[in-house]
Amino acid sequence: NKGLNPGMVVXLVVASFLLIFFVGNYALYXYAQKTLPPKKKKPVSKKKLKKEKLKQGVSAPGE
């Protein structure tokens, strides 16, 4: 028994990287929310949204 097998090590490394990545993103997001002034968006009607989507084709979600 030589301690952990390589598969476990790889999985642990990947898992820890993902964890760090998500925690880092969350921290940055919270930090940005505090420091940046909130952008005031004009309310867009649903008809306009539909027209914009039709014009652009199907745009990336979250834009």
Swiss-Prot record:
Pfam assignment, any one: S1FA
One annotated GO biological process: regulation of DNA-templated transcription
Keywords linked to the UniProt accession: DNA-binding, Nucleus, Repressor, Transcription, Transcription regulation
Biased composition range(s): Basic residues: 38-53
Chief location: nucleus
Segments for region (Disordered): 38-63
Motif Nuclear localization signal location, chain numbering: 37-42
Entry GO terms, CC: nucleus
Subcellular location: Nucleus
Molecular function per GO: DNA binding
InterPro entries the record matches: S1FA_DNA-bd
UniProt record similarity statement: Belongs to the S1FA transcription factor family.
Main function: DNA-binding protein that specifically recognizes a negative element (S1F) within the RPS1 promoter.
Protein name, per record: DNA-binding protein S1FA
Organism: Zea mays (Maize)
Gene that produces this protein: S1FA
